[in-house]
């Protein structure tokens, strides 16, 4: 199985999505999540080299591979890291620090016939995963940042939602 070719196939899917100006961000979520898994490889892939999913995780029930992958994500909150270290019953959330809807909007702004390498550069800049607790996810929801960026977002700070919610990044 050629993992690089699989990674590139998801960039091609995103390219077609952009060219068609399809506003359905659910497809972008699937394509971007899979692109990232094949880009990172290692614990982001299961033993069959398929992308690993991170839904319904509890800190006390993580496999070694899940734990390794979570610890390699772009952002892990102090509370999430503490829960992982203590193997508490805390529910963990894999979160796109810039919501996929916003990433989709950014990608759809690419007019014409974008190259896969340019799409990958945008994903490397804006596709960022966070590990937060269920309670921290509720904080984002309470301040209406569950699926959008803050009104004053500068277009660069990928962790702006977490900053607004007072979610602190752990030091690994």
Protein language model regions, located:
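Histidine-centered nuclease catalytic patch
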Residues: 85-122
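Amphipathic alpha-helical interaction surfaces
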Residues: 76, 100-103, 135, 139
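Glutamate identity and glutamate-enriched acidic tracts
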Residues: 19, 51, 65-66, 95, ...
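A structural signal for short, well-ordered beta-strand segments and their strand-loop junctions
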Residues: 27, 93-94, 130-134, 169-172
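Short Cys/His-centered divalent metal-binding micro-motifs
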Residues: 123-149
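Short linker/helix segments within small regulatory modules
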Residues: 112-127, 150-152, 162
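Nuclease and nuclease-like effector domains acting on nucleic acids or nucleotide cofactors
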Residues: 1-88, 143-149, 157-170
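Generic detector of ordered, mature protein regions
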Residues: 23, 44, 48-49, 105-113, ...
């Amino acid at each position: 199985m050629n993992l690089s070719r699989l990674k590139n196939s998801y960039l091609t899917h995103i390219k077609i999505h952009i060219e068609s100006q399809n506003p359905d961000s659910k497809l972008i979520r699937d394509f971007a999540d899979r692109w990232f898994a094949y880009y990172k490889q290692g614990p982001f892939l299961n033993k069959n080299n398929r992308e690993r999913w991170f839904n319904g995780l509890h800190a006390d029930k993580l496999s070694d591979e899940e734990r390794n992958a979570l610890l390699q994500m772009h952002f892990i909150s102090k509370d999430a890291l503490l829960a992982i270290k203590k193997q508490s019953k805390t529910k963990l959330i894999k979160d796109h620090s810039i919501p996929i809807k916003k990433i989709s909007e950014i990608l759809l702004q690419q007019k014409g016939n974008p190259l896969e390498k340019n799409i990958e550069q945008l994903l490397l800049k804006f596709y960022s995963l966070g590990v937060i607790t269920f309670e921290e996810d509720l904080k984002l929801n309470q301040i209406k940042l569950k699926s959008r960026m803050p009104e004053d977002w500068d277009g660069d700070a990928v962790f702006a939602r977490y900053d607004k919610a007072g979610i602190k990044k752990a030091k690994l």
